[in-house]
Amino acid sequence: MREKRRRFLKFLGLVAGGFTVFGGFKLFKDDIFKQKISPSKALSQSIANGVIRVQSQRSNVFLYASQHVQDMEDAVIKAANAATDFGWLKTGQSVFIKSVNNSGFPYPATSNPIAISAMVKLLKLKGAQRVIVGDMSGIQHLKFYKDKTIGSSRELMKKSGMLQAVEAAGGEPFFFEEGGWDSFYKDHTDTKGFWDNGLMMPEILKKVDHIVLMPRCSRHVLAGASLGLKAVVGYWRTDTKLQYHYHAKSLHERTAEGNRAKTLLAKQRLVISTGDKLLATFGPDKGYVHTPSIGLVIAAESIVAHDMVSLAWLLYNRTLLPAEEQGTFIDTSTAVAKLGNTLAVKWLGTFGNSLMSEKLLKNDLKRIWDDKVLNHAYRIFGGIPDIHLENIQNTVPEKMLKTLREMVHYQ
């Protein structure tokens, strides 16, 4: 309770500062003037107009339920083996595991070290010569500029416990900022949209043969949720991140389109995450940690299909939170999101950038169809996946499976 009070008082200080610096009414007005059309209604209209369709070919998402932390390594291996036959991996090739290392806080604020370790071992067993695990931490914890770097993704990964797990499993830790500003290249998406000028991505991606994405299941104060699609931001150099946050009105769409980067389309093979712990409120670094009675491992070749199920799992578990953790101001307020994004622009760029930047408009997430990142992903990834949930060894209770099916089936 004392820690919770301390965090709240710290937040009030940030709000007060933001209110003073950025202008009170302008900062808070989105709490008064609501969106003219909800994301779910906009999605319905796009489907009715033929802009978005439900895919005819089904997308398999593999679920393995585990009740004990000590079983998680085995659960990850079984889920991965069910989701792919690893036919894409040839002996002697290299694999990059994209973790989520946005801060130094432990799982579920960052990727599950047990899961990362399991995947490193499995890929080695399947013939990979090198398994590289990496990310670049968020702007609140790492200031990476052309002429200086303040902070360290390596030290943050060590603090979270992930670094030790990677090294013990035989993986190679890798941190994008350590190569310097010029160790990034310009990649392009395959869709004409918000990234026509390209994205600055780390050179390591051009050198590896394959990519496995291992996100976590978390709330995100700005984007709504931090799942697989949102993890793409960790690749980007600071100047790309500045564009992302500066043009806040399209932040959700830019998130989705970032996953159409040509390197990712060519090399990403699998998305796998664990949901035995969820950062169920606020996010991406802090919030209420919820531990379900049964934890899910979610694996799929399709990042969109993975995120649909992962978001359903997050939303389902948010209904089970203690009453005092549901509907809190800091978790649901559009003003908090607006201020948070404005501060991110200031950290990434300048005070002037923050004054001129677009204001983020956050919406509530009640159903997966309320998520603007996913809704745009349906448009650019060929439609809404027809999700088929594969219950590995019947470990997922039928009632839970039925609930998830209903949540991800578009009607």
What are these regions (language model features)?
Residues 2-411:
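N-terminal and secondary-structure boundary signal
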